[in-house]
Every structure is written in C-alpha cells, then in structure tokens.
Design a protein with these regions (language model features):
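Metal-dependent C-N hydrolase catalytic cores
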Residues: 1-3, 19-22
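Membrane-embedded catalytic cores of phosphoryl/pyrophosphoryl-handling enzymes
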Residues: 21, 25-167
C-alpha cells in the first residue's frame, strides 16, 4: 500500500509540474502582493494545484485496492481528507479555487485514462489489493485497539489483532 501511495505522489508530481510549466499561472500573492500567506509562497506556478492532484490521485488509487466493505466504510473519509488538503492550500493563500479544482480533475483524468494502462502501477495495485484482501479477512495491524476488537460500524468482520505489529 505504501508503494502504491508513493507511486501516486510521484506520478502526480511529474504530471502536475508539466501542467504548471505549460500554464505558468501566477500565485495569489503575485496578484496581491500584500497577501500574507500562511506558508512561504513556492517559486513555481500555481495551476494546477499539485497538492490537490497528488492527494486526489492517491485517494483514488487506495480506493482501487480496498475491499468493498472497507471502501464503503472509509471511502467518504478518504475523499474528505483529499479534498481538505486542497482546500487548506486555498485557505493558506497559496492557490485559487480553480487551481484546486484543476488538480482534482487532472487526477481523475489520470486515474481514468492512464493508470489502467501502466503495467507497473497495475502490479503495485495488485500487491496492495492482496495486502487488504488477504485470505478473505483483512487484519489491520499497528492500530491501538484491544485484542481482537471488531469494528462494528463497518459490518465487515474486520479483526484487529494487537501484538502483531510489524516495524
């Protein structure tokens, strides 16, 4: 799963920087020099937002590998986290709404049109899917729950086994 997320960030970074170079849109602080951004304004163009692109793409990739029951349980939370990261960059004064929207659209375009054609990424998706689907019942590790706690909200029969942490 970590390899899948890392791949999503790397693909998003490369594609996003290509589009940033192509469109060369100035950031909000360049249009409003008095704008006091929360974070330092990056030196590269604003459009599309790479944070929105990368996190939307990673969210889509993670949801590809989750079993249906976990997708039903956590899909909304994954999408909300992805959206929040892009939205926070607008609040910080680093992006316009159009930058964030475009980043998300590019991620969905990549997922729909290209990810399925990349054999290496598909192999990583398959490996991540095996991690989550292992032997018909997913066992979550490294979570601070008591022994053999079932998460009832998911109705999935997920078993959380304490003491099986892998570091």
């Amino acid at each position: 799963t970590l390899a899948l997320m890392t791949s999503g960030f790397a693909i998003g970074q490369m594609v996003g920087m290509y589009f940033k170079d192509f469109f060369a849109r100035a950031r909000p602080a360049h249009y409003m020099p008095g704008l006091m951004t929360v974070l330092p304004t990056p030196g590269h163009p604003s459009f599309p937002s790479n944070h929105a692109l990368q996190n939307e793409l990673v969210g889509l990739l993670v949801m590809r590998c989750l079993p249906d029951n976990l997708n039903a349980c956590y899909g909304d939370a994954i999408r909300a986290l992805s959206d929040r990261i892009g939205d926070n960059r607008e609040i910080a004064g680093l992006h316009f709404t159009q930058d964030t929207d475009a980043g998300r659209q590019v991620a969905r375009w990549l997922d729909r049109e290209f990810i399925g054609n990349l054999d290496t990424v598909q192999a990583i998706v398959a490996e991540a899917r095996d991690e989550w689907h292992g032997s018909g019942q997913s066992v979550l590790r490294n979570l601070p729950y008591p022994n053999h706690t079932t998460i009832p909200a998911c109705h999935s029969g997920i078993r959380v086994v304490a003491g099986m942490e892998t570091f």
